[in-house]
């Protein structure tokens, strides 16, 4: 039995609770866990004892985190259904850890029909933000967000709102202009595909988030 299959059994035999935290009298400490698909995905950053591979996280019993407030950042290369990334978020929630992206976010971003309605109110914000920006002369562009942050100041408020709706470490947001600006699509970004300049932005945003 593979690690993924074994931990699917572990998760399926539990009641999946919402991420909850111990009260102040019982909370002993907090812990950050950063999950990567492969160790080399973290090669551009400082070594950290917070880093574990997806395989390691799935094979751990979770006993070491008992009594701790745990934040999990899932940076797997893919969150496809029944893949390692999906199982890591599923298992984190089963253990009571706070994880991004959540299983709900993973499910919603797989189909625009599920997340499209949440974007309707943001189109007005987008139109106002881009009305006097350099991008106003283009037909479209894709913006990469890191923990809800962007270097494009007029779009920072929109980036924050998107992160509040779809909390995910890296998001690729496609903007198009057809009789006004709108969000054409949103998909997950991947750590191992970032350029060098993007790696710096990601690192700064991660520091601010964690």
Q: Which residues make up each language-model segment?
A:
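Preference for protein termini
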Residues: 2-210
